């Protein structure tokens, strides 16, 4: 099912309901993102004459850390299988300085988009690819006795992976005895009897040695040259010993890739990134200019001016082709403790017309976060200990006390939102997680007294609270 079909089936109200399964509160932010997503679907149904005039309304989320800014964007992208990329504004530097090139955010998005399209296309060719992979695997488990013709390699060919590789698909002479043997192996293979056997397969190396030498830390400008060189020289292959179970996956991916048109994959990946892509720019408040900032202010403003043309709409070169960023949805987020949105350059402010202020989390929100979402933290810890045969039970009073402590610690020290629950639960269950394999108990109940016993000493010492919780 394509992401356009998914959006067709989901109204803004339904999108918010799906987000409610994972994120507590923040209704305003959920509504704004849901409407932005639905507008993209509406745009696809319009005539071309007006469609090109409608661009996404970018969103600026304002709120402290840990209240759900990133999670809202990430979850909504998963719901509709839209290409999604998260970047941190502080990682970028002005052109001419060492650091990530701002255009890399678009390249990252295209990589995600192509991967999503490839996954969908691999499902379409799954049956044929699995059949071809099985044939190759049977030949590896029961090889022909006929010796393969060896080919000489000069040193350069050896370095770049070899130009003259034997053709695995070449016809081979198979006698009746070998046919019978392969028939038996096929039956055992399909029944999973050989999954733990070891077989040698050829796999492509991830990087060419020469490209590894040329790669520099943070040098995104080298991507184009690396991609060009990787296309000139074939990927070097190496032999690996793996289980039959793993070999099935390796050979399936190889066979599926052969059945997928690379040009069509690149074109569709670029189209989806352009029309459905979402880029989340976190910590944008950290590059906001402030009064009297000196050289640091100039540098931050330079990054903003580098980001501006991408948000406005420009042509970015990637290894798959040129990408137009005009219709990509940008969601920027920041706490804005030390600065305010008006500290951003006016041109960039104007490109984020929808502004949402997210609410700080209350004690009641913490309780709901612990219990209601499908991926609630308490459910995660219960599942972890279930693997040890222990049924972990939390009383209502215990959960309320955990929520109260999390809220109080956030009030007394830095407010890190829902992330505080991770540190508190980890400290609370530390001994239990350590001793679980040796505990001969079917169930353990976490009560309010247990919570107080484990956390009260730390709560009473403000210095310990600051460093431990």
From Swiss-Prot:
This entry carries the following GO cellular component terms, namely: HslUV protease complex
Alphabetized, the UniProt keywords read: ATP-binding, Chaperone, Cytoplasm, Nucleotide-binding, Stress response
Give the Pfam families listed for this entry. Answer: AAA, AAA_2, ClpB_D2-small
Q: Where does ATP bind?
A: 24, 66-71, 282, 347, 419
Superkingdom: Bacteria
Q: Give the principal location in a single coarse category.
A: cytoplasm
- Swiss-Prot/TrEMBL GO biological process terms: protein unfolding; proteolysis involved in protein catabolic process
Say which family it is in.
Belongs to the ClpX chaperone family. HslU subfamily.
Outline the subunit composition: A double ring-shaped homohexamer of HslV is capped on each side by a ring-shaped HslU homohexamer. The assembly of the HslU/HslV complex is dependent on binding of ATP.
Protein purpose: ATPase subunit of a proteasome-like degradation complex; this subunit has chaperone activity. The binding of ATP and its subsequent hydrolysis by HslU are essential for unfolding of protein substrates subsequently hydrolyzed by HslV. HslU recognizes the N-terminal part of its protein substrates and unfolds these before they are guided to HslV for hydrolysis.
NCBIfam families in alphabetical order? hslU, PRK05201.1
Protein name (record): ATP-dependent protease ATPase subunit HslU
Species the sequence originates in = Listeria monocytogenes serotype 4a (strain HCC23)
């Amino acid at each position: 099912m394509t992401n356009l079909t998914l959006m067709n089936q989901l109204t803004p109200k339904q999108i918010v309901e799906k987000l409610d399964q994972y994120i507590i509160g923040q209704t305003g932010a959920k509504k704004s993102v849901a409407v932005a997503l639905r507008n993209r679907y509406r745009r696809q149904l319009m005539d071309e004459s007006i469609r090109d005039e409608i661009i996404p309304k970018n969103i600026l989320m304002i709120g402290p850390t840990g209240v759900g800014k990133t999670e809202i964007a990430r979850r909504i992208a998963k719901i509709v299988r839209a290409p999604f990329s998260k970047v941190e504004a502080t990682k970028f530097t002005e052109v001419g300085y060492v650091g990530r090139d701002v255009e890399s955010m678009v390249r990252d998005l295209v990589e995600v988009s192509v991967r999503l399209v490839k996954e969908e296309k691999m499902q379409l060719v799954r049956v044929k690819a699995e059949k071809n992979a099985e044939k190759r695997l049977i030949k590896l488990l029961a090889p022909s006795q006929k010796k393969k013709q060896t080919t000489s390699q000069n040193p350069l060919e050896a370095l770049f992976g070899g130009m003259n590789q034997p053709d695995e698909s070449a016809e081979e002479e198979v006698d009746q005895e070998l046919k019978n043997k392969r028939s038996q192996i096929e039956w055992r293979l399909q029944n999973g009897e050989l999954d733990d056997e070891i077989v040698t397969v050829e796999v492509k190396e991830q990087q060419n040695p020469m490209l590894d030498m040329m790669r520099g830390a943070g040098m995104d400008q080298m991507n184009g040259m690396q991609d060009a060189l990787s296309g000139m020289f074939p990927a070097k292959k190496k032999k690996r010993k793996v289980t039959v179970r793993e070999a099935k996956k390796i050979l399936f991916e190889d066979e599926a890739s052969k059945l997928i048109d690379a040009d069509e994959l690149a074109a569709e990946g670029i189209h989806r990134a352009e029309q459905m892509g979402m880029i989340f720019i976190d910590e944008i408040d950290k590059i906001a200019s402030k009064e009297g900032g000196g050289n640091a202010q100039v540098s931050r403003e330079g990054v903003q001016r580098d980001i501006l043309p991408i948000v406005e709409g420009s042509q970015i070169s990637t290894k798959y082709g040129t990408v137009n960023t005009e219709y990509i949805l940008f969601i920027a987020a920041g706490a804005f403790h030390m600065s305010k949105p008006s500290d951003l350059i006016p041109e960039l402010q104007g490109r984020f017309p929808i502004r949402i202020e997210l609410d700080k989390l209350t004690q009641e929100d913490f309780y709901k976060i612990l219990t209601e979402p499908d991926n609630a933290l308490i459910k995660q810890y219960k599942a972890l200990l279930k693997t040890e045969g222990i049924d972990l039970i939390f009383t209502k009073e215990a959960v309320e006390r955990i929520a109260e402590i999390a809220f109080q610690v956030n009030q007394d020290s830095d407010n890190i939102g829902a992330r505080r629950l991770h540190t508190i639960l980890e400290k609370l269950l530390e001994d239990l997680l350590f001793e679980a394999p040796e505990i001969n108990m079917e169930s353990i109940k976490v009560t309010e007294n247990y919570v107080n016993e484990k956390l009260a000493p730390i709560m009473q010492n403000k210095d310990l609270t600051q460093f431990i919780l």
